[in-house]
Amino acid sequence: MNIGFDMILAKLPEAYAMFDPLVDVLPVIPLLFLLLAFVWQASVSFR
């Protein structure tokens, strides 16, 4: 089981090379939601 998983993991780089820019952006998305919360609160005057 573990050997098969390692083989899948080894194949990931070439299979998903086109998604590399997407993976680089993914960690930023929660920060965007945090920023959106502040913008929303500012728009409703921090009720």
From Swiss-Prot:
Superkingdom, according to UniProt? Answer: Eukaryota
Q: Please tell me whether the keyword Nucleotide-binding is annotated for this protein.
A: no
Q: Which InterPro entries match?
A: PSII_PsbK, PSII_PsbK_sf
Q: Which Pfam families match?
A: PsbK
Q: Provide the propeptide boundaries.
A: 1-10
List the membrane topology term(s).
Single-pass membrane protein
One GO CC annotation: photosystem II reaction center
- Set out the biological process GO terms recorded for this chain's protein: photosynthesis
Where exactly are the transmembrane stretches of this chain? 22-42
Q: Which UniProt keywords apply?
A: Chloroplast, Membrane, Photosynthesis, Photosystem II, Plastid, Reaction center, Thylakoid, Transmembrane, Transmembrane helix
Q: Where is this gene product found? A: Plastid, Chloroplast thylakoid membrane
Q: Which family does it belong to?
A: Belongs to the PsbK family.
The subunit structure is: PSII is composed of 1 copy each of membrane proteins PsbA, PsbB, PsbC, PsbD, PsbE, PsbF, PsbH, PsbI, PsbJ, PsbK, PsbL, PsbM, PsbT, PsbX, PsbY, PsbZ, Psb30/Ycf12, at least 3 peripheral proteins of the oxygen-evolving complex and a large number of cofactors. It forms dimeric complexes.
Described purpose of this protein according to its UniProt entry: One of the components of the core complex of photosystem II (PSII). PSII is a light-driven water:plastoquinone oxidoreductase that uses light energy to abstract electrons from H(2)O, generating O(2) and a proton gradient subsequently used for ATP formation. It consists of a core antenna complex that captures photons, and an electron transfer chain that converts photonic excitation into a charge separation.
Name of the molecule in the record: Photosystem II reaction center protein K
Q: Source species, please?
A: Mesostigma viride
